[in-house]
Swiss-Prot record:
The keyword ATP-binding applies. InterPro entries: aa-tRNA-synth_II/BPL/LPL, Ala-tRNA-lgiase_IIc, Ala-tRNA-ligase_IIc_anticod-bd, Ala-tRNA-synth_IIc_core, Ala-tRNA-synth_IIc_N, Ala-tRNA_ligase, Ala_tRNA_ligase_euk/bac, DHHA1_dom. Its EC number is 6.1.1.7. PROSITE patterns: AA_TRNA_LIGASE_II_ALA. Zn(2+) binds at residues 564, 568, 681, 685. SUPFAM superfamilies: Class II aaRS and biotin synthetases, Putative anticodon-binding domain of alanyl-tRNA synthetase (AlaRS), ThrRS/AlaRS common domain, Translation proteins. Catalyzes the attachment of alanine to tRNA(Ala) in a two-step reaction: alanine is first activated by ATP to form Ala-AMP and then transferred to the acceptor end of tRNA(Ala). Also edits incorrectly charged Ser-tRNA(Ala) and Gly-tRNA(Ala) via its editing domain. This is Alanine--tRNA ligase. It catalyses: tRNA(Ala) + L-alanine + ATP = L-alanyl-tRNA(Ala) + AMP + diphosphate. It holds the Pfam family tRNA-synt_2c.
Amino acid sequence: MSGVNEIRSTFLDYFRDAGHAVVPSSSLVPKNDPTLMFTNAGMVQFKNVFTGVEKRPYVKATSSQKCVRAGGKHNDLDNVGYTARHHTFFEMLGNFSFGDYFKADAIELAWTLITKEFGLSPEKLLVTVYADDEEAAGLWRKIAGFSDEKIIRIGTSDNFWQMGDTGPCGPCSEIFIDQGPTLAGGPPGSPDEDGDRFLEFWNLVFMQYEQVEPGVRNSLPRPSIDTGMGLERMAAILQGVHSNYDTDLFRALIDAVAHAVSRAPEPSTRASYRVIADHLRSTSFLIADGVLPSNEGRGYVLRRIMRRAMRHLELLGARDPVMYRLVPTLVREMGQAFPELARSEALISETLRLEEGRFRKTLERGLAILDTETRDLAAGQNLSGETAFTLYDTYGFPLDLTQDALKARGIGVDTKAFDAAMLRQKQAARAAWQGSGEAATETVWFGIKERTGATEFLGYDTEAAEAVIGALLRDGAEVETLKAGENGIVVANQTPFYGESGGQVGDTGTISGPGLKARVTGTEKKLGDLFVHHVTVEEGTLAVGAAVELKVDHARRAAIRANHSATHLLHEALRQVLGDHVAQKGSLVAPERLRFDISHPKPIDEAELSRVEEIANAVLLQNAPVVTKLMAVDEAIESGARALFGEKYGDEVRVVSMGRPVDDEGREVEGRLPNFSIELCGGTHVSQLGEIGQITVLGESAVGAGVRRIEAMTGTAARRHRATESRTLSQLAGLLKAPVADVPERLSTLIEERRRLEKELADARKKIAMGGASGGGDEAREINGVKLMARVVEGVEMRDLKGLADEGKTRLGSGIVALVGVSADGKAGLVVGVTEDLTGRYDAVELVRAGAGHLGGKGGGGRRDMAQAGGPDGAGADAALAAIAEALAAG
């Protein structure tokens, strides 16, 4: 029973038998808490339950929660691999009571589990309690038989938990195990409590107060329980090891790393193996929960974790991408407990493979840049922190790698300046991700739902229905009536209007009654099943309790249905063409068009898009019925139905099946599953696939790293789009005097010819600007013993000025070139180049600044051998060159 998977099952089964609902782990991306970057505790998904604004169908629960601590206040990243218990990813086992049982039962349940089920010796156990919590101390004496020496009173915040400045709070009791005198350290509360001998493994939080304001606490009428046990710590205890990395799960991962790099762990490399094993877990679970590597927010943290692991693979001698080859081992070890890991295996592997390939290029590029930036630094000097951070932030070159690369030369890094730049980046990252999850739902909806109940949705079967108004809102506050000319929100007992969700926009239409007409401009869902209609009252008055008729805009709903069904066909066609790693990451299903985002690491070419469109239309032409069926969620997944990222599913789900399997040519074939597409979906769909009419893919684009966006049209809109394209193509053929089939080739030839002529023209202008191909005897004058070539050039692009300056320096051999380029709109660009032998005497930056003011510019920048500036006043070109000549004469 000491394996990680067995321990998890024992914990959950124990509390299930004690009447707790077993609640699946929530996503690592918090859905209702914009203050958190990642889910970092078991209670996060129950926060609204603890505060009383949300009710669940159970009053006590248990879970094994996925947690990540690698950003924000809870950041263990830099310690991972170098200590026995720090992780970026870990599982928190917990049991929770929402006003059901309290201290006595919580302590009794915990004691029975650890001593009877887990078999821990009571003699090795001890606890801490909050200094003022006499009740908890008495319960430990009674239930566990502990003496006062084994009940340690702690008066600090370590044993008093608060959700925030206000809200539920209460004392804690932590359970410790004495691992024996062979390990250093003293009991909790002693000066050497940070040693390894006494290990805390379970924290029981007794939420019995509400913090009203600083210094003011009230007792809660129904106190609650929140506990958290680290699964990895408990596994180490039960397996008799003193490091989490020596448990069965981590041993399997570390063995996989050793096999992949063909190198056995040694004491000097142990930290690298641990880093890779830990980061593989956090990386894989974050990708499975929809986070992809990027340069901001959660994706920024993910990329940092990934690249830290990849850096350690590099230290172990890996020269090709390796990390993706470790994913199957992780899925084998944890995929049964977390099915999302197995479902996302292809995406995780491909994302890791591509990211590691990019990182290896980053290493090469970063080392080259580092060499350039430190050419003038001697041993004992420091590289600037800003430069080190630019290497890290722009090029993904880690600080530790920069330090390692410079260590052999005796060069350090200004880490204070680096930390300051990092702080600015973290603040920018926090601004990017804060609120990117679902905003915390307004409490007003909880009150309405408690009073009116959930809205019954009738829209699968009808587009019109009678209903009774249960609530009205205007400007966010409940009202009794809405009058003509007023805008507001209507909540009814039932509705045919679809509420925006799953990417499908909400319905529009009308609400009517005797002397009443209101226009519904949109429909949303709150709290999962409370439908809210945004309305403008055009005639009469809407009143709470009134009976009304709700009618959906039929034409708009029909277009939305067609587009939603088309997304299912396109999604499956994309998987068939691109691979099983493709997963939908978001969508917009509107009446005019559809778009959806998929996980795919590179652009989708025209040939692939064409095949996708052909496959989807081939299935459409089957005109097969679209079948919907209600099933248990586990049964649906086992049957092959695809669950979409970001969607929440209840115990019972709606499964939508479409079409018969086809091959890449659109021919019907026998498939592994009976249908072409099977997805969990709560949206509205066509009855027969033929109702879609036609699917036209408009194109694809990048949304972020590893995410592509597909846009398409259906039905009449698709036909009109194709007709417009056809007319445009015919017009092009007429202008080119070529058959339609030859238009691409003719256009390509013309474009290449234009490029050739433009290059010839640009080269000719450069030669004219610099005095012809042969140069000239009078092209430079001598000032203060130095040759100066100073010239105003016209008809030359600003980007070409540097090239001309380099050409001038070559002609001179030794000297200075000053060029002013004046554009057609009168703006000017100034470039000064100094040959290498003169850079000790003259600085191109100073010379540029001498002339820039005459062009209306400020300053200038560059290096000693080449600098540039610009300004709005090209009329000052001659004066600028004269000023440079004067500066040269002044020495």
